[in-house]
Amino acid sequence: WLPKQCSKHKWAPKTYQSNLALIQNLIIPYIGEMQMQKLRPYHIEALYDTLSKTPCGQYVGGKRRDLSPKQQKRTLSGTTLHEVHQLLHNSFLLAVEWGILIKSPVPVEAPKKTTQERSIWEVEEMRAALDSMEDPILHLAVHLTLVGALREGEVAGLTPEDIDFDAANGMGTFTVNRSMQRVQKDTLAQVDKGCILRIFPDKLEGSKTSLILKDTKTEASCRTIFMTAALREELKQWLERLKREEALDPERYRNSGMLLRLPNGLAVEPVLIRKKFLKWQDAHPEFPRIVFHGLRHSSATYQLMI
């Protein structure tokens, strides 16, 4: 069922990987041995009740893990339960359509999503945070995110060709139309390759994952963003820095072609941006703690001040 749906709806790699994880870790361990025709709504309701008390990460890759007392306290969210419901709803609806079942056992009412208010920074906190970031990769990633409300993958997916310093009467713009992700190689074998623009070479032999560059989610995700004067200057300096780093050792420089690169030319992955941000937060407890994605929500406030 999963590969067929993936092909039919042209799922992105992350979508396939996420749905596969839901099936392996939250559905099969609990109702996987039951006959489909014997499932009733109360079985599904019982599953939701069990999952609501289940610790995050209890199963990984379909295998049960031993968790510490601290890990056992963090249970699955209502949003995750809602995702399980949607997956079951769609799969059993198809079973009815295919004539395998007469009626779907999935209850009409879905578990309620968990809504959490995201923390954002105030204007002065954003200014002070940028001033305190000495890591040039992190500084540029955060600056781009605050100006353009970018996701981590979109920041990592930018290339020098996306930057136009002459656009908008010299104000400058940058275009967002790609996203970088690391996905399981098994996933790549199942998904539509049409959305994948590039698969990066493996850093380690025998790696089970691949770093890819893909189209952004929707046409609305493709956008052109005006630069601020400060970002324009930082981008100019950054591109000069890339040229200098390549000139130091051109034979060993591994030019990934991405905007954000390590000194050796390799692409900066989204997870590295996240780790750098966490490291900075640990070193600066005076700032309200937010996840990197929270910077995207702080972007609207930042844009009002420029």
Which residues make up each language-model segment?
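Short, basic (Lys/Arg/His-rich) helix/loop patches that form interaction surfaces
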Residues: C56-V60, D131, D135-L138, G148, ...
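Short, Lys/Arg-enriched alpha-helical recognition elements, typified by the DNA-recognition helix
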Residues: W1-V96, S256-L259, R274, L278
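Residue-level detector of conserved, well-ordered beta-strand and adjacent loop positions
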Residues: E45, E109, R118, E122, ...
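Arg/Lys-rich amphipathic alpha helix in sigma70-family domain 2
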Residues: L93-I102, Q237-E240
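Basic, Lys/Arg- and aromatic-enriched nucleic-acid-binding interface segment
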Residues: G57-L87, E97-P160, A168-M171, L211-I212, ...
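Conserved tyrosine-mediated DNA breakage-rejoining catalytic core shared by Y-recombinases
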Residues: A110, E125, L158-R244, E251-R254
